[in-house]
Structure formats: C-alpha cells, structure tokens
Amino acid sequence: MIKAIIGKIIGTRNDRWIKQYKKKVLAINALEPTYEKMSDVELQNAFEELKKRVRSVEKDLQEKTLLEVLPESFAITREASKRILKMRHFDVQLIGGMVLNDGKIAEMKTGEGKTLVATLAVALNAMKGESVYVVTVNDYLAHRDSKEMEPLYQFLGYSVGTITASVRDDDERLEIYSKDIVYGTNNEFGFDYLRDNMKYSLEHKVQKSHAFAIVDEVDSILIDEARTPLIISGPVDRRMENYNKADEVAKSMQVEVDFTIDEKNRAILITEEGIKKAENLFGVDNLYKIENAALSHHLDQALKANYLFFIDKDYIVANNEVVIVDEFTGRLSEGRRFSEGLHQALEAKEGVSIKEESQTLADITFQNYFRMFSKLSGMTGTAQTEATEFLEIYNLEVVSIPTNLAIKRKDLNDLIYKSEKEKFDAVILKIKELHDKGQPVLVGTASIEKSETLHALLKKERIPHTVLNAKQHTKEAEIIKDAGLKGAVTIATNMAGRGVDIKLTDEVKELGGLYIIGTERHESRRIDNQLRGRSGRQGDPGVSQFYLSLEDNLLRIFGSDRIKGVMEKLGLKDGEHIESKLVTRAVENAQKKVENLHFESRKHLLEYDDVANEQRKSVYKFRDELLDINYDISAKIAENREYALNQIFSKLKAFDHQNLSEEELLGLKNILKEDFNASVELEDLEKASPIEKFVAEKLKSDYENKMKALDSEQRSRIERIVYLQILDNAWREHLYTMDNLKTGINLRGYNQKDPLVEYKKESYNLFLELIGDIKIEAIQTFSKIQFENEQDSSDAERYLDNFSEEREHESVTYRHEEALDEDLNVAVKAFSKTPKRNEPCPCGSGKKYKDCCAKSGPKKGLFAK
C-alpha cells in the first residue's frame, strides 16, 4: 500500500525507465528524415559503417559502442522495415527494442508487435559478429517469424537460419548455426548444446558462442518449463513385471485407510495398515529393507500414478503411449517422459506397453542453459507477476512497455457459484446469449477433460463451436486465428495459440469485440492474464470474466475459508452467484500462495542443479581443451601416470624396496601386469632403487615404444579420442551416481541435517573421486593400447576412421531418440581385467565394483588394509 502511494507521488521505477527511454526515442526520430532521403544502397552502406565501427573495437568495449550507435542503428532498421516489410516501428516499439538491448524483459501486451520489436535489438547486436539467437516456444513460430523478418535482415546484410526438429542432418545444422541470426525453439537450442558436448571434434560443434539471446514468451520458457530439465538418456535394465505388480497393489489400496493424499504438496503418505497390506501382497516381510528398496519405490510411483495423475488432465493416451500434457501451456509434450519410474507407472496403470527407464547421459536445465549467455533478454505479455523470480534467478528486470493505443477491454469481477454444475450451466447460458447476437467468444478451460465436458454441453444445446486442446494441437494457429469471426465460439485450454493474433472485423468491434470467459482460475495469475490478453489487442474493444465454483481445485485446496463463509451466510439458492471485489481479491491471494510454492520449488531445484552445473562446466571445459589440437595431451598422460603410481605406492608400507615383503613385491608385479600391461621380473623389482622411479620409467618407455610408429598428428588424435571416451563414460557414470544421491538425500532431513548441505558435500567428494577415477582409468587404458602392427601407422588410421564412422552413426541415433542405446566403442584395441564401476565386483561380495574393491582395493595382496 505504502509502495503504491509513493509510486503515485514520485513515479515508479518502471516510470523512470520509460522516461529515460523516451529521450532516446526523440534522438532516433530526429534521424528519420535523414535516412528517408537515402537510396537503398546508401542506407545499406550507412549500416555497414556502423558494423565496422563496432567490430573495430576490443571485445570488452563493444557493448559500450553498441549504445553509441544505437540511435543510428534503430533509425536505419526502422527505415529498412518501412521499405521492405511495409511496417514502421512505433515509438513504444523502439522503447521495447532498447529494453531488449539492455538485457531486460519487455512486457508488451498482445498485438503490440513483439516480433517486429525484436528486429531492432537483433540487428544491433549482430553487429558484433557473433550469432544472435531468437528463441520461441514452438517450431511453427520459429519458422513463421524467421521467414517474415528474413527480408529485412538480408537488406541489412545479415544471414538468417532456422533450427527446427525437422532439421536432422548434422552438416545442415552446422550451416544454420553459422548464420548471423538463428531462430529456433528452446528445446532445440538446449539439446544442441548437450549434443555439442558429446562431439569428438571442435569443428562439429554447432554452437560456437552464447553471446546474446532474445527469448520470446519468456515467461513460458524460463518460468513454466524451468522445472523440466533437458535430458539425453540411455536405457537401464529394470524388471518390467515390478511395475505391473506395484500397479495391482496400488489399485487394491484404499484412500484414508491404506494411504492419505496431500493435494497441496501433491504427495501420498502410506499408513501402517497400507504398509502391512503391501508387504502381504508383495510377499515380503519388510517393505523397507534395503533389498526391497526397488519395490517400495515402484509402489510410491504407482500410488502417485493412480491417485495424483489423471488422464485428459496430466496426460493422454495416444497410439499405445502415455503422452504428457504440459500443465501451463496445455500442449502435448511429445518425447518428454516423467522421471524416476513415474512414466512407467502410468503406462502400467493405463495398460499400454511399458518402456524402459533411462539413465541420464547428459542434462541441463533451461535455467542454467540460458544463464550461460553473456546477454539475455526476453519478451512477453505477462511478466510482472513473476518479476521477483526473473530478478533472483536470471538477474533480469521487467519493464512494462506502454501500449500504442489505450486498452479498451473491460475486465469484469469473477462470478462464484457453489457447484461446478451451476457454474457450467451459467457459462452455457452466457455463451448462448453472446452467440445469438453474433459476438465471438473464447472460453478458456484448465484441462482437456473440462474442455470436452464443455464441448458436450454445447453440443447438447446445438451451439456450433470449435475445440482447441492438446488433441487438436496441429490446427492451433488456424483455430485461434478464426476465433474473432462473427458468431465464433472457441473452447481452448491454456495453449490458446500464443503468438497468433486474433483479428476483428469492424462489425465484430461494433458488437463489443471478443468476449473471454474463463471457466476456472489457474494456479498462476499470469496464465489468467494471458487468456484475458487474447482480447483487446491494439485498442480493440473486448470483455473478460471468470466463472468459478467452490469445487474448483484452486478454491478447494488453497482458497480462503472466508469465501465459503460468505456464501453460506448469504444462503445462496441453486444457480445464484456472488460477485465482489473482496472475493476476487481472496482468489488472487490463493493464487499468490500457489505461485510462491512453485517459485520456492523452482528455486530449490536450481540450488541442487547449480551444484551439478559447476561440475558440468568444469567437465565440458576440460572436454573442449581435449578437442583443441594444440592441447598438450602427452603432458596430461604423463601427469596421470604420476598420479596413478602415487596411488599405488601410497598403499605400500615403505618406498624402499629393502623393506617390502616378497608378497608385496609379487602383488606389485601382478598389479603392473593386470592394470598397466607392464611385464617386470620380480628380481628387477628387488634390485630397483628407488622402486617408484624404476616403475615410472618402465611404464613410460613401454608406452613410447608402442606409439613411436605414429607421426605426431596420429598420436595426438588417438590420445585425445581415447581420453575423451574415458571422460565421457566416467561423466555418465557420475551423473547416474548423482541421480541416486539426489533421490535419497531428503531422508537426511530426518537426521536433523540440511539435505542441500549434505548434497553439496557428498557431490563434491564424488566429483573428486571422479577426477581420480578418470586419471587412473586413462593411464591404464593408454598402457594397454595395442596395434596389430606397431610398425605400421596405417593400422592406427584404420582405428581412427572406424571410430569416426561409429560416432557419425551414433549421433544420428541420439538425435532421433534423444537417447544413446550403446556405450561408445573404443577406437583402439585394449584389454582390461578391471571391471567397470557399475559392474558386479569380481570378489564375489555381490556389490557393485565402485562400492567394493574400487574403493578398498582387492581383499588380499597389495591393497590389503
């Protein structure tokens, strides 16, 4: 309240920003007459001079130079747009362009021309000579926007490319990313980054830099999708019958008897009775014994699948598959799967074929991907409600841009009914009234299920209408475009065709414009504002109103008891409603509660991902060093050899051979043979002094003799490729271990420990272990490299060629599947008796190798404690 009063007196922070930008608008407008007089060639030459000026300065001074040339750049871009696109940027669009250039979020209402606004900042920032990425929510918008704006960019001397899911050829993607301006979806940009860090050549990496990105519908991408990481994964063996058995057990359990449901936190708590029933049905004496951990996990997921996730709301079943419905956009999330076995639990619930669980091979969140950019900005019609999150997570400030024409839409108070049936009856009556007079109406629903309920009611009343939900997503743009026609009735879920304008005829404007009916408040005010924003574009008339009931999820779970109390006191009859600002405010307060819960959830996830992200950056940086032909890989191998030998000798009783027992010398001899393929005589070890120097020189000479047939280029390539494979495999194993750590870390809270602190500690120790494992495995592998003919370098070339072919084939596989089905094949012939970290330990303990002898050493011999 106090903040609002101060804002009215001295102006808000947003007002002050707009005031500053308006001064620059005057400078840009003053240049317009000059550029209007120029010929096309003169205009293009003037723009080229600006490019030269920006590129002539040091990189750290380029941002400052961009600000200096901004008025000329914007004025030329506007003039070029007038000539090429027949569209002139309004003053408010110039302000939007400046906001984007400053690395902020421009909040611009629907129909204000965000696509055209972006051209100002894109054309300016592309002067630096690094690709500018324009990020959209789907392939349709990426293709549409790039094709519409390409003639303007070409006039200014820029090349334009579009990355979509249909571009599958590596060379074609590489060519597109070489363009000055690249349009694409957030998914494509993110997956390409992950793929780049699985490539075995710097030349094959498509994303050369992360200089500047403009994210369209920034709230959808950076807020709504922030909880969903991008993952490239491979299959993991699991017993498929466990999913079906867990589903049977879950279906036999009773709510409030065997388990309780916490709707607010979307969790299920099993009671003592439920545990006993599950143990009886599974045939185990203790569900929570370590050997039954998989069963208890499957049961947890089966209960969630059966009692927290609902068909036509959270997912649909199509073509014998469970397909996720995005809760914020209402779109189908094709190719995306719930993690931790939940998707398999849903498949068991619906009786469709169960697909294997997967192991993460590479992953990143949108939060950490977009935070890599030197400069990031965004556009949307709805950002202010999430301004705090944008600032805290992305360091992005939100600037609300004034509309070019005043908004004429009327936003009416909510109408609240006692039951859902009464609410829908009232909605149908209103639709009939509007349809009879010819005023178009767009009805927003929160789920596919509700949209189809409304569809059935309208069909019963014989009111012609069109339904837009995830099941009809292919016609999205066409359906939304026609929603403003006279007499049109359109039912839409949250997807509501973002990025597609609903244009009105003069006749429809006379009838009052597009009428928006919301049949339920979403958990986020922003989604409601997006629905409202479909009406009243560019000064058009329009109306919006929400119809609610006490049975709506938001009011039932989070709503204030005050609303229920008011309705009970009023003694409303069937079909009657209440309408008041007090009630509307109470509903918005409920939404704020949920928004805060989601924000804390996203922030919490980011805190965990930040730990992995620092490790990811270190690994990817080292990976790039290995890909660099100038990197001294031989020095790295020598360093690893020293480290590995230090690990061996640190376990010996003494460094002087005179104090080593015969058993220890024999153990050392065996280790050198088995792990490093080095044959030494026992008597040579007995004579050697100091022994560590003798062993180090032996390993080095064996390796040098093996590699001497190769020229320096061949040797460097083989060493880099083998090291990369070791690094990649170890990183994948590390991600698997980190996934397992994250899954169980919250249990530390029961021991009065902060799970996040514990996660940071353990993940750091795991990372140190990873680095050590890589060094030891690298020197072991290099020691075992064997060529069929060590005097013939062509043998090494064949290995390199075969490796390149395997990698090329594999890259196509994971581009289609977003998964790798097999481990990489080593590019050289190697042999090893050392098991992989996740294989059973050869000592017979039944544990994984990494949890047994990899840590403690063999039970007998050299590494005995």
Curated annotation (Swiss-Prot):
Zn(2+) binds at residues 841, 843, 852-853. GO terms for molecular function: ATP binding; metal ion binding; protein-exporting ATPase activity. Its EC number is 7.4.2.8. Keywords: ATP-binding, Cell inner membrane, Cell membrane, Cytoplasm, Membrane, Metal-binding, Nucleotide-binding, Protein transport, Translocase, Translocation, Transport, Zinc. It is found in: Cell inner membrane; Cytoplasm. May bind 1 zinc ion per subunit. The keyword Translocase applies. GO terms for cellular component: cell envelope Sec protein transport complex; cytosol; plasma membrane. Monomer and homodimer. Part of the essential Sec protein translocation apparatus which comprises SecA, SecYEG and auxiliary proteins SecDF-YajC and YidC. This is Protein translocase subunit SecA. It comes from Helicobacter pylori (strain J99 / ATCC 700824). The gene is secA.
